[in-house]
Amino acid sequence: MDYDRRYAAVILVVLSMFLHILHSLPDGDFIIQGCPECKLKENKYFSKGGAPIYQCMGCCFSRAYPTPARSKKTMLVPKNITSEATCCVAKSFTKATVMGNARVENHTECHCSTCYYHKS
């Protein structure tokens, strides 16, 4: 009986230490390793011709929530979870001509917004 109490006490101490360490880390520390925030980054390929060309690059996050019952009824393949993804896109941009006659967008401001183009 005394052995069981010590065993339970050790488990509780280890669990509380683990929770303390996990709680003290910044939010999302394990999730976003190596993924920078959504911001402007110089495009080295298009910047060769003179003026720098900037593109929005980085990570945004998605959210998931339970699918509302009325929406589930209209789905061909009903799903319990609905997800909404956001992508790093230009909030504003200017048109620029590079490499003679190629027109590109030179991004001036970025934000996370609805994804319109998905990779297949």
Swiss-Prot record:
It is found in: Secreted. Glycans are attached at residues 80, 106. One of its GO terms (biological process) is regulation of signaling receptor activity. Residues 1-24 form the signal peptide. One of its GO terms (cellular component) is extracellular space. GO terms for molecular function: follicle-stimulating hormone activity. Keywords: Disulfide bond, Glycoprotein, Hormone, Secreted, Signal. Transmembrane segments: none annotated. It holds the Pfam family Hormone_6. Disulfide bonds join 35-59, 38-88, 56-110, 60-112, 87-115. Its main location: secreted. The keyword Glycoprotein applies. InterPro entries: Cystine-knot_cytokine, Glyco_hormone. Belongs to the glycoprotein hormones subunit alpha family. Heterodimer. The active hormones thyrotropin, lutropin and follitropin are heterodimers composed of CGA, a common alpha chain described here and a unique beta chain which confers their biological specificity to the hormones: TSHB for thyrotropin, LHB for lutropin and FSHB for follitropin. Shared alpha chain of the active heterodimeric glycoprotein hormones thyrotropin/thyroid stimulating hormone/TSH, lutropin/luteinizing hormone/LH and follitropin/follicle stimulating hormone/FSH. These hormones bind specific receptors on target cells that in turn activate downstream signaling pathways. This is Glycoprotein hormones alpha chain. It comes from Meriones unguiculatus. The gene is CGA.
